Amino acid sequence: MSANTYMQQYKKATVEASGPEETLILLINEAVRSAEASRLEQDAEKRGQLLDKARRIIAELSSSLNMDYGGEVAFNLLRLYIFINRRLADAMGGETDGLTDALRILRHVQETWHRAVEIARESAAAQG
């Protein structure tokens, strides 16, 4: 088996063994990584693939929001995800400001999710 195949199997096993919080963190990290990598990519086709990957991840995060349970927080996240996807689409069209905007918001969302999961773990540990 190639190193790439092993890596794909490792990633799949990691996601399958993760809880929803860890899966969310893995996804948002990968969206940020793909968007950042697209900035450095010289090949237009590969850059487009990286941006498309980030867009698909954000679309998946959007579709997983529970609007009934999440209320205003879920609605605001949906609005952020829509904005990020729009700006990534603009970046696919060659607009460099689109990628800058998308990455700025993506990093903020990433940081917020990391902190939220950390707080939830601390709270769970304190309760027993």
Segments from the language model and where they lie:
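N-terminal intrinsically disordered, cationic/polar leader segments
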Residues: 1-37, 46-53, 59-66, 72, ...
